Swiss-Prot record:
Belongs to the AccA family. NCBIfam families: accA, AccA_sub, PRK05724.1. Keywords: ATP-binding, Cytoplasm, Fatty acid biosynthesis, Fatty acid metabolism, Lipid biosynthesis, Lipid metabolism, Nucleotide-binding, Transferase. Component of the acetyl coenzyme A carboxylase (ACC) complex. First, biotin carboxylase catalyzes the carboxylation of biotin on its carrier protein (BCCP) and then the CO(2) group is transferred by the carboxyltransferase to acetyl-CoA to form malonyl-CoA. It comes from Salmonella arizonae (strain ATCC BAA-731 / CDC346-86 / RSK2980). Its EC number is 2.1.3.15. The gene is accA. InterPro entries: Acetyl_CoA_COase_a_su (IPR001095), ClpP/crotonase-like_dom_sf (IPR029045), COA_CT_C (IPR011763). This is Acetyl-coenzyme A carboxylase carboxyl transferase subunit alpha.
């Protein structure tokens, strides 16, 4: 897979382009007298060191760009890599099936679980079909239907959050967008089974929180979680989206800051360069964290689960 490099990764992109050129020349003419392999190896080591140096000092705006990376693994990628026997379930039994939310029953190391998450889509047609990962009310009602099903069958619930926000269209508002989100917040706080939520990309506002009330809340290293996008915040405060980098720093949208504020429990490390560089390794780390969280929650009573979850929800907004 050819990698897409972000603006701040251009020095890395230039090195990788040189490596690709040398590799192509080597393949075309195997009778070359010079030792290209040594040069390629040297450049690869230099690329790794440069990547390590750049990623050791990322700002909040750069992390926000990584969270939106077009090659970043989505919910269905993690379902494929970390779970077995996934059986997708569709529809809210009231209006429609919202493709921006996917969910179904799967097995995690043999244990039945309910997996629910946002799905953005990659190609243009799929992005449109998935509405760029922005759910309408029927998406959140589908998610709630699946969560209530999980409760009936005593299955843990695992959610993956990756959305710029709930869809703000007129139709969505007419069908009760705010009510659907509010109902999910209330009902998730009352469910009798363990809930583990993980932000895998963008955690945008109420659209993220509507499947984000859990007993454990994790974030991938280069994901974000905020009440508004940096561009939206900049447009309101400075009347210019160009101030988005400044807004990103001020908002505290990155995982270390949110863990410091006790809004999340764990930060799951990503491979060097981000999750898209090695989805298999990222999925293995995510799976290990989910299994660890389930083991911690299995020893708690139902009342303890609900009390802790409710207190977490009520603590949001307090310093």
């Amino acid at each position: 897979m050819s990698l897409n490099f972000l603006d701040f990764e251009q020095p890395i992109a230039e090195l990788e382009a040189k490596i690709d050129s040398l590799t192509a020349v080597s393949r075309q003419d195997e009778k070359l007298d010079i030792n290209i392999d040594e040069e390629v190896h040297r450049l690869r080591e230099k690329s790794v060191e440069l990547t390590r140096k750049i990623f050791a000092d990322l700002g909040a705006w750069q992390v926000a760009q990584l969270a939106r990376h077009p090659q970043r693994p989505y919910t269905l990628d993690y379902v494929r890599l970390a779970f077995d026997e996934f059986d997708e379930l569709a529809g809210d039994r009231a209006y429609a099936d919202d493709k921006a939310i996917v969910g179904g029953i799967a097995r995690l190391e043999g244990r039945p679980v309910m997996v629910i998450g946002h799905q953005k889509g990659r190609e243009t047609k799929e992005k449109i079909r998935r509405n760029f990962g922005m759910p309408a009310p029927e998406g959140y009602r589908k998610a709630l239907r699946l969560m209530e099903m999980a409760e009936r069958f005593n299955m843990p619930i695992i959610t993956f959050i990756d959305t710029p926000g709930a869809y703000p269209g007129v139709g969505a508002e007419e069908r009760g967008q705010s009510e659907a989100i509010a109902r999910n917040l209330r009902e998730m706080s009352r469910l009798n089974v363990p809930i583990i939520c993980t932000v895998i990309g963008e955690g945008g506002s109420g659209g993220a929180l509507a499947i984000g009330v859990g007993d454990k809340v994790n974030m991938l290293q280069y994901s974000t979680y905020s009440v508004i996008s940096p561009e939206g915040c900049a447009s309101i405060l400075w009347k210019s989206a160009d101030k988005a980098p400044l807004a990103a720093e001020a908002m505290g949208i990155i995982a270390p800051r949110l863990k410091e504020l006790k809004l999340i429990d764990s930060i799951i490390p990503e491979p060097l360069g981000g999750a898209h560089r090695n989805p298999e390794v990222m999925a293995a780390s995510l799976k290990a964290q989910l299994l660890e969280d389930l083991a911690d929650l299995d020893v708690l009573s139902t009342d303890d689960l609900k009390n802790r979850r409710y207190q977490r929800l009520m603590s949001y907004g307090y310093a």
